[in-house]
Amino acid sequence: MAGISYVASFFLLLTKLSIGQREVTVQKGPLFRAEGYPVSIGCNVTGHQGPSEQHFQWSVYLPTNPTQEVQIISTKDAAFSYAVYTQRVRSGDVYVERVQGNSVLLHISKLQMKDAGEYECHTPNTDEKYYGSYSAKTNLIVIPDTLSATMSSQTLGKEEGEPLALTCEASKATAQHTHLSVTWYLTQDGGGSQATEIISLSKDFILVPGPLYTERFAASDVQLNKLGPTTFRLSIERLQSSDQGQLFCEATEWIQDPDETWMFITKKQTDQTTLRIQPAVKDFQVNITADSLFAEGKPLELVCLVVSSGRDPQLQGIWFFNGTEIAHIDAGGVLGLKNDYKERASQGELQVSKLGPKAFSLKIFSLGPEDEGAYRCVVAEVMKTRTGSWQVLQRKQSPDSHVHLRKPAARSVVMSTKNKQQVVWEGETLAFLCKAGGAESPLSVSWWHIPRDQTQPEFVAGMGQDGIVQLGASYGVPSYHGNTRLEKMDWATFQLEITFTAITDSGTYECRVSEKSRNQARDLSWTQKISVTVKSLESSLQVSLMSRQPQVMLTNTFDLSCVVRAGYSDLKVPLTVTWQFQPASSHIFHQLIRITHNGTIEWGNFLSRFQKKTKVSQSLFRSQLLVHDATEEETGVYQCEVEVYDRNSLYNNRPPRASAISHPLRIAVTLPESKLKVNSRSQVQELSINSNTDIECSILSRSNGNLQLAIIWYFSPVSTNASWLKILEMDQTNVIKTGDEFHTPQRKQKFHTEKVSQDLFQLHILNVEDSDRGKYHCAVEEWLLSTNGTWHKLGEKKSGLTELKLKPTGSKVRVSKVYWTENVTEHREVAIRCSLESVGSSATLYSVMWYWNRENSGSKLLVHLQHDGLLEYGEEGLRRHLHCYRSSSTDFVLKLHQVEMEDAGMYWCRVAEWQLHGHPSKWINQASDESQRMVLTVLPSEPTLPSRICSSAPLLYFLFICPFVLLLLLLISLLCLYWKARKLSTLRSNTRKEKALWVDLKEAGGVTTNRREDEEEDEGN
């Protein structure tokens, strides 16, 4: 209806436009509509000529192709629609409604998300000429339906006059600004009648009652409250019979179009709640119910119920026993008791109460013989008068309820273990059930334990009729193995539970049930026994250690599995697993890692890097150790230790129940097998002097993995029988080192190594000369770096030999091969000569190198007299010991100073010829030759006195120390003489003083007189 009124006003506005030029207008957009709901778009044309009834054509431009027109429907051409809309037009889902001759409405009954787009209304021209607009566009946006309305479906039974409250949840999640309206409806029984509106909250947040509920809304009998953002509650204070039927809630979502008109876009209804209303009845009946077995000592509760009364009657109840009133409760809840029962109520033996508006209760907590008889209740409906007193309107009484006490009968006792298990594992809970048969009565129970190999029972626990629990001496205090708990399941069933059992808990358990009787002097008792066994956890504990690869390649990964086998695998007991390691060089096991039963991981500190490359996984009865990047440090013996705890150990600090250690397992970490292969073919290179050459070292295959190579180049001169000399070495870290014989600047510049590719290395030799002739080869080493930073050599291969020859230059050096030998005395000088048989041209220079060799030792370069006259010593210490010079054009001399015994051996020289070559000119070694080996024998010299003295260490020490000893003795003698002379002088002086003292004493008087006279003379002067 809102859409039709909008369209009417829309077209009324458009008719007011002046007629002159054609103008087509459509509803202003954008228009937001929900998926699955209808939409109507109006189109009007004015200022047209021709017939009053104009034709309209509707098209859409979809967002996927905004420039492509998709034809929907036309009032002129039935075949106007494109294929995507043909079926919807035929089914009536899309149609055009003509409002007037120049106005239409495009209807889409059920929107789809693909219907979103820009809609165009076009009017074919009926004018004499084109003047004005012939089409107009508007945007339609299809949004998801997010409206939700829910209410639980239920059936309610109410009495007339009672209140009713129903809650409806309505929510939306639309991105656009929308309003929500909520309406409650009632459908009368039969389903064919139209729903009656009860009350609604409009989109403008205004409460609007339905036509039939206006008066009740004004009287606040019908209300609609919004409890939260999405919660709406319908409240009816006093139900009427006309309210019976099905109630439901309808939520409607509204949106405001650009022309400020509100349009609904979604609408949802909830499930229905069926309401049945019972008419109010003024009359009532009274019944009495008894809840008891009528046994002595048992409680008795009598309930007086009022049936079919009004909604809220004012009732008072009166209790009678054997026709005598014992208690009453008025309508205000005031209690009145007779004297005897007032005393029993004060002692807690009796309770009279009002359970509800229509229920009264009389409760006796412990029945006795005095309580046998007939009970009756009387209920009166009353109303309060103006004076405040209660006026009885009607009175009803219940039938009598007779109470007769039952006599105690013989009982049967059944004892069993919980879950029917008489064999449990250590640490498990042991639970016993003791059930007494017969009539309900207060019972007490006591539990006894007879350990194995004993006959005397031990008291475990007991519970009296009052529920007080007593524990035995050995069970009263929590011990190592747990606690004892006694529980009363019902009046006849008792449970004894011993948690964290130990092996000592095995044996026979006895349950004694007792019942007291007022008419008997002794209590009645019944007994039952059962035997149980507690098995040790350690008895079935087995630990095994295994590995899929006890022999591991270096840097590979290996795993160790510690498997626990026990007969109690289903108990899920906590385990502590300790991994231990004994290195190959030790006899002591060290802790690697400890996974405790409470989840804590403790790492040992024996292997520093072990934690960073180890993964530990642990399940209930299995622990796995995964070690990555194995090194030689991990070589050794492994074992695992398992400790079993009880299930409550997470909350206490009890020691383990059992433990076991696996067998030791040896893990060997070995180097991987080398797959290195080097080209072993030999070759010969013949070169011109002073040219450059390359010697290749080709690798045919290598081992897999992150391995590094070391390349070492060796050289063996042609003219000597010396061992291979190291030229250059490029180690596995790409550091280049020069051999001992190639440290000179000239040789460092001559030889260079290069890594051409991963599998090809070259030795570059610059300016080849005669001294470079010989054989060359390379040695390739494979190195593996372990995680601890240690390099390991996997293998070594040597290449084939490359022989380097020089093309003839016409020059040839010949050194005299005359055999020479000489004996020389120690500490003398000796000269060794090397002679040329012929001398070359004046442009030729010569250099000589002197070598020395001794049996069981390698050759040694002593000195090198270069072609330019410079001397280069093999060792710096030889500079003072020997001298090399050229005595003539054909003679070279090596002179040894102060020959020692160690200088004996073979000496020889190597003479090289040098000439200038190339531009710019450079001295090149063209040819060389060696002399015959010359033998030098050193004889020991004749010993002299100084030499003998120096050669004897004791004599040398004696000659050095003796003067000091004699000097010391002389000083001591002089000191003694001085001391004796001084002592003698002192004695003589003392003798003179004694004599002088006697003379002085004799002449004392005269001396005194003379002194006084002298003093007087001095004063007179």
From Swiss-Prot:
What InterPro entries is this protein classified in? Dihydroorotase_CS, Ig-like_dom, Ig-like_dom_sf, Ig-like_fold, Ig_sub, Ig_V-set, IgSF_V-set/TM_domain
Q: Where in the cell is it found?
A: Membrane
User: Which sequence ranges are marked TM in the entry?
Assistant: 955-975
The terms under GO molecular function for this entry are:
hydrolase activity, acting on carbon-nitrogen (but not peptide) bonds, in cyclic amides
Q: Name one GO biological process term.
A: cell surface receptor signaling pathway
Q: Which domain of life is it from?
A: Eukaryota
Q: Which residues form the Ig-like C2-type domain?
A: 22-139, 144-265, 279-389, 408-525, 541-651, 656-794, 808-925
Cytoplasmic compartment ranges equal 976-1021
- Which Cys pairs does UniProt list as disulfide-bonded? 43-121, 168-249, 304-377, 434-511, 562-640, 697-778, 834-909
Q: What is this protein called?
A: Immunoglobulin superfamily member 2
From what organism does this protein derive? Homo sapiens
